[in-house]
C-alpha cells in the first residue's frame, strides 16, 4: 500500500515531513536551592516590603548572588504563602500562634538517665544529656539558650532546615553543652 503526501504518521504530527524541523523541547528550569544566608536576606526584605520595586530587587539580587528574576519569583511565591497563611489564620477565628518548623528527633536528646558516650573508647561523657524539652530552655546552664528568640526568622517561618542550617544548629548545641558542662 502506498501513501500519498498528506496521509500517514508524518501528516498526523507523528514526525517532521520533508523540509520541516522537529519541534523543540520546552526547557524546564531546575529547582533553585537557596542558602540559609539567601533565605535570611530575602525574608528580611519581605518583612520590609511585600512588593519591592525593581531597583530594590536588583540590589537584593546582587547582594545574595542570584538573578533578579529568581528574586522576583521568590517574592511572588512568598506573597502566595503569606496570603495562604492569612486565610488560614482568619478562617480559624482566633489569632494563630506562630508556627515553628518541625524539627526531626535529635539523636543526642536522650532521657537524663542515659549517659552520653561520645565515642566508645572515651568512656562515659557528661553525667547525662537533658531531655529535649529541658534543652529547649529550662535546663541548668541553658536558660533561654534555645528559646523561641534563638532562631532566625527564616526558621520561624516554616522553612525546612537545610544542611547548612542543621550544621549551625549542631554547632550552637555543642556550644550550649560546653556552657552547661564546662571542662575541668
Swiss-Prot record:
InterPro entries: HD (IPR001356), Homeobox_CS (IPR017970), Homeodomain-like_sf (IPR009057), RAX/RAX2 (IPR043562). Its main location: nucleus. It holds the Pfam family Homeodomain. Signal peptide: none annotated. GO terms for biological process: regulation of transcription by RNA polymerase II; visual perception. Keywords: DNA-binding, Homeobox, Nucleus, Sensory transduction, Transcription, Transcription regulation, Vision. The keyword Protease does not apply. Residues 1-10 have a biased composition (Low complexity). GO terms for molecular function: DNA-binding transcription activator activity, RNA polymerase II-specific; DNA-binding transcription factor activity, RNA polymerase II-specific; RNA polymerase II cis-regulatory region sequence-specific DNA binding. It is found in: Nucleus. Residues 1-32 are annotated as: Disordered. Expressed in retina. Stronger expression in cells of the outer nuclear layers than in cells of the inner nuclear layers. Also weakly detected in brain, testis and spleen. GO terms for cellular component: nucleus. Residues 27-86 bind DNA. The Homeobox transactivates the Ret-1 element in the presence of CRX and NRL. Interacts with CRX. May be involved in modulating the expression of photoreceptor specific genes. Binds to the Ret-1 and Bat-1 element within the rhodopsin promoter. This is Retina and anterior neural fold homeobox protein 2.
Amino acid at each position: 500500500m502506498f501513501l500519498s503526501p498528506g496521509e500517514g504518521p508524518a501528516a498526523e504530527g507523528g514526525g517532521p515531513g520533508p523540509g520541516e524541523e522537529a519541534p523543540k523541547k520546552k526547557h524546564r528550569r531546575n529547582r533553585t536551592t537557596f542558602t540559609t544566608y539567601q533565605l535570611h536576606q530575602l525574608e528580611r526584605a519581605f518583612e520590609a516590603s511585600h512588593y519591592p520595586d525593581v531597583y530594590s530587587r536588583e540590589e537584593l539580587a546582587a547582594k545574595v548572588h542570584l538573578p533578579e528574576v529568581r528574586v522576583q519569583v521568590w517574592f511572588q511565591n512568598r506573597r502566595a504563602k503569606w496570603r495562604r497563611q492569612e486565610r488560614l489564620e482568619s478562617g480559624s477565628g482566633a489569632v494563630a500562634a506562630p508556627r515553628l518548623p518541625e524539627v526531626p528527633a535529635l539523636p543526642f536528646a536522650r532521657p537524663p538517665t542515659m549517659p552520653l558516650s561520645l565515642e566508645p573508647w572515651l568512656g562515659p561523657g557528661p553525667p547525662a544529656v537533658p531531655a529535649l524539652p529541658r534543652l529547649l530552655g529550662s535546663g541548668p546552664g541553658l536558660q533561654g539558650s534555645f528559646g523561641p528568640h534563638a532562631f532566625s526568622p527564616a526558621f520561624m517561618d516554616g522553612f525546612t532546615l537545610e544542611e547548612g542550617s542543621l550544621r549551625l544548629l549542631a554547632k550552637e548545641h555543642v556550644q550550649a553543652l560546653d556552657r552547661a558542662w564546662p571542662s575541668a
